[in-house]
Amino acid sequence: AGLQWLASWPWAVVFLPAAPLWAGVLALLGGGLLAMRLPWQLRLWSVPLLVPLLCWQAPRPAPGQFELLAPDIGQGNAVLVRTATHTLLYDAGPRFSRESDAGHRVLVPLLRALGERVDVLMLSHRDADHTGGAAAVLAQQPGAALTGSIEAEHALQGLRPATPCLAGQRWVWDGVAFEVLHPTGAEPDHPARPNTASCVLRVASAEGGPHAQAVALLVGDIEAAQEQALLARSAPVKADVLLVPHHGSKTSSSPAFLDAVQPRTALVQAGYRNRFGHPAPEVLQRYAQRQVPVVESARCGAAIWSSARPDVVECERDKGRRYWQHTVP
């Protein structure tokens, strides 16, 4: 009881962004200096050695630019969209078991390590591989607004009321334009296939400046019929990077849609050797025929893409490989 009482105090627990190695080394030196039996005038020199670790902030995109971070959350979707001062989380990954989900195991630790405050959590649709970690994220991010294609009686509505995502919704953060392209609102409240009501989000960097405009398209689990509907409405789907629809399922990535999007890079979030066979070989073949490189989370780990360098995808498995990790065949 005493420990619980102490833990309830404000600032009883403080989470700091993960600082780089050099800041940790300086902090160790500073801590050692502070602990030594030296005159206080000398021990004061430990303070500047501790400051980098205590005050570290993760680098953010420049105004007008944005970054996508697609963590390896297994069979599901979760993409962090970061601008200069704002953050949107698109989907929250799968639930692994009754006691474990992508929110607790991946997203909350990631958000803490980056020192992120999420402004908006957008859930593309109600399937558990997209909403499984949402409760944990909402608990850790009390200021995050919730939006998405989830029905009024969904359990998450009891945690935080959700605003429906609808085509035509637009906003601008730090010069970066966000636009919802789907659903239109004409879909039934309880579609037989929730995939069909997936929120499609277009994110575009600012025009002009030192970089050409770059566009990302996050499409959830839309299928060929919704892809065709977007084309029929002349929706602005052309993009530099595409989150592959429905994890690379046979039901999506129709040839006409890929021809319209013309992505430079395609990201697939799917579990290693998942039981659905995602991404399907014939779907990968469609991208290969169009010379579009496909980056799979099972092989890449966390993938990082920046509008300032739209031709480059950084793979955490390559950047931070540990000696005990094996190469995925």
Give residue ranges: language-model regions:
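Binuclear metal-ion centers of metallo-dependent hydrolases, dominated by the metallo-beta-lactamase
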Residues: A145, S149-G175, E179, T184, ...
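Short internal beta-strands
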Residues: V120-M122, A144-E151, T265-A270
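Active-site-proximal loop/helix segments of hydrolase catalytic cores
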Residues: G103, L107, S124, A128, ...
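Transmembrane helix-bundle segments that form internal channels/tunnels in multi-pass membrane proteins
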Residues: A1-L69, T265, R286-E296, A302-D318, ...
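Conserved beta-strand hairpin/beta-sheet module of binuclear metal-dependent hydrolase folds
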Residues: P63-P109, A113, P194-E223
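Pre-active-site segment of Zn-dependent metallo-hydrolases
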Residues: T87-R126, I222-V237, G320-P329
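Zn-dependent metallo-beta-lactamase
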Residues: A35-L89, C165, R170-V172, A177-P188, ...
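Divalent metal-coordination and catalytic microenvironments
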Residues: D72, V81, D91, L111, ...
